[in-house]
Amino acid sequence: GLGDVYKRQGDVKKGITLDVSIGSRSAKSDSRYQGTEAKESRIVSQGNIRIKSDENIAVKGSQITGENVTLQAGKDISLTAAENRKTTEGNSRSKGAGITASFGIGGLQNVGISAGKSKGNMEEEIMTHTGSAVTAKETLAMESGKDLNITGSKAGGKKVEVKTGNNLSIESLQDSHTYHSRDKESGIHLQRDITVRPDTGKKKMDDPYFSIGKKTDTTDSTYISVTKQAGIYAGKEGYDIQV
């Protein structure tokens, strides 16, 4: 820049310098997004709700709410969660090259040539769950001929009555957030300096300086956690569970 003062091994030069550079650069990036989101269904009543099936009763990512709620199935009752998933992918690329020259009072001082390129990619995925909820203000009764499965969901009331012909299973689900990125850069630089010997006043071209640089940055992150506990919840009148 203007007013640069520099000193180098045995050569001393003070004065005004002018830096000139010519170059070009191009860059391109793209991203893709994909997502699915559950929209819950609802059965809501100020009175009683009774659902009976000779086969199975399956509730997924939905709500059933009433004064007294009864679920009766000849086979299985399943309260499960719906999945919400968001995925983002991205890529970027760039490259460039340039020539630089520095001029001082004595003329040309150095010439440099540089070139470089970079590329990167990233992937991110977020998965959450929308659980089912079966809630009674008073009594919740669930009776299955075979299994009662509660996965990532809740069932509750002031009093809860459960009767199964086989198994009772309760399982919480884990939400997750994963992120991966990788960025790579590389470049080269060639430079030659021209100096003036103070004893002779003659110009000489120094040995060329050549450098190569490479860099890679990688990020990997994974977060997994149960954010909502599945379960059967009873109020002051408690549970009556028969398995």
Residue ranges and their predicted role:
Residues 1-243:
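Binding/recognition "hotspot" determinant
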